Amino acid sequence: MAKGAKNETVETLKAVAVAVAIFLAFRILAFQPFTIPSSSMEPTLQIGDYVIVSKYPYGWSRHSIPFSPPLFSGRILQREPQRGDVIVFKHPTDGIDMIKRLVGVPGDRVQFREGVLYINSQAVPRERLSPEPVRTEYGTLEFDRYVERLDSGKSYVTYDRPDRDPEVNNTPVFVVPEGHYFFVGDNREDSRDSRFPRGYGVGYVPAENLVGRAEWVLLSWNEEASLWKPWTWFTEFRGDRSLRRL
């Protein structure tokens, strides 16, 4: 190989390496995209939403890095999340990505009574909205809707069917341990979250497992959209859900 061609190849490889390094640094330190695979956060997030998650609000842990290599423990520049934040975290048992709403911080006492969320013995204020038909695996069902307002200033809409599952609508008091957090889905009847032990739900989530805070729904498609059917990229696009701040 001529010297000039060899130098050109080396420079090209250097440029590629720099580009990859910049991409990885951006993904680890700043922002990362996620897709929503389940209905557990409806109506806030729906299957097919493409969400942008910021990686820096709570500092960084090994779970900020792809494949969660055991390079260090704990968090670097740790900052506390707020109740009401929508957060991506690693499941404490199997390490899969989860997205739920934070309602309990260390020391909090969390409980559900007749479907009402209580934090430290105080009922979270909520306003009833008109019921909404929701498509589920059991067909279209009518869900109650409520606006919950946390003391952090966050408000959001939840789905609820208090007549369906007494186990999730009437719980024991959960005392959140130090260094852990308590998460629930906005779709209270279809979310395996901190109300359930890790074998079925997620239990208490260690601070180290937090990945980042969901900021935007960037783009969104209906469930019928398919990578292998290009026309559905347009026919199933949900423009009304795109570019939405969370």
Task: Identify the meaning behind each predicted range.
Residues 2-10, 29-35, 40-246:
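Soluble "head" domains of membrane/secretory-pathway proteins
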Residues 14-29:
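Hydrophobic membrane-insertion alpha-helices, especially the h-region
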